[in-house]
Curated annotation (Swiss-Prot):
RNA-binding and homodimerization: annotated segments: 1-73
Gene: NS
PABPN1-binding, as annotated region: 223-230
InterPro entries the record matches: NS1, NS1A, NS1A_effect_dom-like_sf, uS15_NS1_RNA-bd_sf
Entry-linked Gene3D superfamilies: Influenza virus non-structural protein, effector domain, S15/NS1, RNA-binding
Gene Ontology biological process terms, A to Z: symbiont-mediated suppression of host cytoplasmic pattern recognition receptor signaling pathway via inhibition of RIG-I activity; symbiont-mediated suppression of host gene expression; symbiont-mediated suppression of host mRNA processing; symbiont-mediated suppression of host PKR/eIFalpha signaling; symbiont-mediated suppression of host type I interferon-mediated signaling pathway
Protein origin, superkingdom: Viruses
Sequence motif Nuclear localization signal, residues: 34-38
UniProt-recorded name of the protein: Non-structural protein 1
Subcellular location: Host nucleus; Host cytoplasm
Length: 230
């Protein structure tokens, strides 16, 4: 196993522990707590994949971080912070909408890269909106935290979420996954639109009908994908 993979996991475990202690003191805001829960699932998945114990990794990560801090000067820290572009966290959904449990009468699941797409194929003839919480850097979607599909009545009928065991995805991965979800929901004559915020940062455009500018070829491909899996 690559030593950098192990040490990266160890440092991530320790930094998660520090953030958890911060949250336990009721100092974290909603985006902070949301990322904390997501990262916990990711660490569990990575630990299982690597065959590493999280508690042991956390202790090792603490030693690595302490060694780095001992060597770090205040001036070097200021320069590092100044050189790193800041990302923004954008929210279409409330914390309640993100954490709410939901159930599917006819569940369908598809994995696309490091993203998991889930939808309820029992939903028909509904108006549906896709909402997402995600981070943005350089005015482009950076990381998807969670996307969910809601009916006008507020019911959750679909979802796109990162796989904890496969971290890392691009904005193109997210757009392709959204296309698959739209194709699956429209197969049952639902009308789907995407939130303005998600359109603006994923596609750099905003249509009044809420439809992202998917090329006709991509639409046909997605329709065939859903049809073959039903």
């Amino acid at each position: 196993m690559d030593s950098n993979t192990v040490s990266s996991f160890q440092v991530d475990c320790f930094l998660w522990h520090v953030r958890k202690r911060f949250a336990d003191q009721e100092l974290g805001d909603a985006p902070f707590l949301d990322r904390l829960r997501r990262d916990q699932k990711s660490l569990r998945g990575r630990g299982s994949t690597l065959g590493l114990d999280i508690e042991t990794a956390t202790r090792a990560g603490k030693q690595i971080v302490e060694r780095i801090l001992e060597e770090e000067s205040d001036e070097a820290l200021k320069m590092t912070i100044a050189s790193v572009p800041a990302s923004r966290y954008l929210t279409d959904m409330t914390l309640e909408e993100m954490s709410r449990d939901w159930f599917m009468l006819m569940p369908k699941q598809k994995v696309a890269g490091s993203l998991c797409i889930r939808m309820d194929q029992a939903i028909m003839d509904k108006n549906i909106i896709l909402k997402a919480n995600f981070s943005v850097i350089f005015d482009r979607l950076e990381t998807l935290i969670l996307l969910r599909a809601f009916t006008e009545e507020g019911a959750i009928v679909g979802e796109i979420s990162p796989l904890p065991s496969l971290p890392g995805h691009t904005d193109e991965d997210v757009k392709n996954a959204i296309g698959v979800l739209i194709g699956g929901l429209e197969w049952n004559d639902n009308t789907v639109r995407v939130s303005e915020t998600l359109q603006r940062f994923a596609w750099k455009s905003c249509n009044e009908d809420g439809r992202p500018p998917l090329p006709p070829k991509q639409k046909r491909k997605m329709a065939r994908t859903i049809e073959s899996e039903v």
